[in-house]
């Protein structure tokens, strides 16, 4: 018998160890805009050894957690369905998923409250979010259910009397189980799992990603750097103001200013080739045209 554990409880975390879960499968398949397969591998190794999670949350996850209950109530109000909250469903010996709920019509529910849409904007369909599509398919596979609801919720935002007040909104898609999905992705999941097992005893995953420097000397260097950056910003603003004043003196015409050319440049267009290729030739092998850009260091 499968015992359902409350989500995010110690027992729930224990059930998920060394399992390729619904929330991670999109990243494992290289579909996530936020995580790479190597990031998931490191997280899973650390989880296996009981190391502290390196992800402590961000505004997007905080927003989603804060509005989870409202999103659930709005879904039930909109659809008339009841939702039973649930825990982790294992699938086989190395996969599983934790949907946000089981619907009274025999489906599963995945709720999202997109942080990027909190102030308005259009909901993206699931077809444009393949990492979530993979999550939903894994949830149906693990629960043995044949359909799912992918529900996106936007909470009211701002002052109701203001012109820019954002009203509550919801976008719900019914998704059918794709019986061939697991066969298509299983080879890639198998490769990842073999890599995971091979890396379980690699101590690098348990070491900090960054060393910590708290010396007085480093503090002085940061202060100097911040001062330089502030000065650069101020210089850039002053440069724009000077150019604007010269343009005004020239009457918005090309001019010679003490022998130096003041020239109006024309608008130009550019093509986002990477985005165009991804849309026009998805999955194309571009390795022949790849080049290596030498890395460096940046301080943020």
Model-based region annotation:
Residues 1-300:
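Accessory terminal regions of nucleic-acid processing enzymes
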């Amino acid at each position: 018998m499968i015992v359902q554990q409350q989500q995010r409880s110690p027992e729930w975390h224990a059930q998920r160890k060394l399992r390729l879960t619904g929330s991670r499968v999109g990243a494992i398949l290289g579909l996530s805009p936020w995580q790479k397969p190597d990031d998931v591998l490191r997280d899973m190794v650390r989880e296996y050894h009981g190391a502290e999670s390196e992800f402590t949350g961000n505004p997007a996850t905080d927003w989603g957690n804060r509005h989870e209950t409202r999103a659930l109530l709005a879904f039930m109000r909109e659809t008339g369905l009841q939702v039973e909250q649930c825990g982790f469903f294992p699938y086989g010996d190395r996969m599983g998923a934790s949907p946000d709920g089981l619907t009274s019509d025999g489906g599963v529910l995945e709720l999202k409250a997109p942080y990027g849409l909190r102030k308005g904007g259009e909901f993206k369909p699931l077809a444009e979010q393949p990492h979530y599509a993979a999550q939903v398919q894994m949830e149906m596979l693990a629960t043995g259910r044949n359909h799912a609801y992918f529900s996106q919720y936007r909470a009211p935002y701002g002052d109701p009397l203001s012109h820019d007040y954002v009203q509550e909104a919801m976008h719900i898609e019914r998704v059918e189980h794709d019986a061939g999905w697991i066969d298509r992705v299983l080879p890639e999941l198998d490769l990842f799992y073999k890599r995971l097992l091979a890396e379980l005893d690699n101590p690098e995953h348990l070491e900090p990603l960054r060393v910590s420097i708290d010396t007085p000397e480093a503090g002085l260097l940061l202060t100097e750097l911040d001062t330089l950056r502030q000065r650069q910003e101020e210089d850039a603003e002053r440069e724009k103001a000077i150019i604007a004043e010269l343009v005004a003196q020239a009457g918005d015409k090309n001019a010679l200013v003490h022998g130096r050319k003041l020239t109006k440049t024309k608008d130009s267009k550019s093509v986002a080739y990477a985005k165009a290729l991804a849309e026009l030739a998805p999955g194309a092998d571009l390795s022949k045209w790849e080049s290596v850009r030498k890395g460096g260091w940046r301080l943020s």
